[in-house]
């Protein structure tokens, strides 16, 4: 394949993802150790990522790798996107269809609840333990997840699980980088909850994936534009190309 110009992303150009098996194992460990005494907050993009997270939770529940789950999806957009996914279930692969049907048939293993109103969302904050709360936005810059963080970050019994990239300057990035205190609604909030990053679900290719794709070109492009990445990650990809 010959290209005059190539545009390539570099989001994870300087790192490798964990395997899917390792991702499932870490998620299961966080859920098993946290839920008896606290809640697990999962900031997630409403379209695509939330549905993937629900798939993983159902897979762990069906395999008996986690205790019975009560999962709240607290995002109107995520609710709508999940309903669309369910509406077109016949075109999904068999594994996904079977898993969705299993979850509906076994609410005692995974109870799935979608919030309808702001009042429903606020009621979740009264739960002290046993809740998995999946809410937008994925980088914690807006949305209902900020309210859940305000109520759960100060509690060492709770955990926050990130499944996607956190850009510099976002609340999510501050938490991933180990901030001891953040500001929410103009007030300081101490961070005592544990914070976990599970990279195996990312939609962005890691360094190995990017370089493997580049190897598919029989002739090098005349020009390559490295985009969509922080300076360090873009530089690593650029150096490999050179």
Region spans (language model):
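Short helix/loop capping segments that flank catalytic or ligand/cofactor-binding pockets
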Residues: 15-18, 51-52, 81-83, 142-144, ...
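Active-site-proximal loop/turn and secondary-structure-junction residues that shape catalytic pockets
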Residues: 12, 49, 77, 166-167
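A polyampholytic, Gly/Pro-enriched intrinsically disordered region
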Residues: 89-104
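Short glycine-rich phosphate-binding loop at a beta-alpha junction
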Residues: 41, 71, 223-227
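C-terminal regulatory/interaction regions
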Residues: 59-62, 101-242
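His/Asp/Glu-rich metal-coordinating catalytic cores
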Residues: 1-52, 58-65, 70
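Short, conserved secondary-structure transition motifs
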Residues: 49, 70-87
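Short, surface-exposed amphipathic charged segments that create phosphate/polyanion-binding patches used
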Residues: 84-92, 210-213
């Amino acid at each position: 394949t010959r290209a005059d110009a190539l545009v390539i992303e570099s989001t994870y150009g300087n790192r490798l993802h964990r395997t899917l098996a390792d991702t499932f194992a870490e998620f299961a460990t966080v859920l098993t150790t946290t839920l008896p005494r606290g809640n697990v907050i999962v900031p997630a993009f409403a379209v695509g990522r939330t549905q993937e997270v629900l798939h993983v939770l159902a897979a762990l529940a069906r395999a008996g790798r986690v205790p019975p789950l009560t999962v709240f999806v607290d995002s109107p957009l995520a609710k709508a996107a999940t309903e669309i996914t369910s509406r077109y279930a016949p075109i999904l692969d068999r594994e996904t269809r079977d898993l969705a049907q299993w979850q509906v048939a076994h609410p005692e293993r995974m109870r799935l609840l979608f919030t309808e109103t702001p009042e429903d969302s606020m009621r979740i904050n009264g739960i002290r333990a046993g809740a998995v709360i999946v809410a937008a936005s994925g980088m914690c810059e807006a949305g209902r997840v900020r309210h859940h963080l305000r109520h759960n970050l100060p509690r060492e019994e709770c955990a926050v699980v990130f499944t996607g990239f956190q850009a510099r300057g976002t609340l999510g990035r501050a938490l991933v980088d180990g901030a001891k205190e953040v500001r929410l609604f103009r007030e300081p909030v101490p961070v005592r909850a544990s914070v976990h990053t599970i990279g195996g679900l990312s939609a962005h290719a890691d360094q190995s994936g990017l370089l493997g794709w580049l190897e598919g070109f029989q002739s090098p492009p005349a020009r390559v534009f490295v985009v969509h990445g922080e300076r360090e990650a873009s530089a690593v990809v650029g150096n490999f190309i050179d």
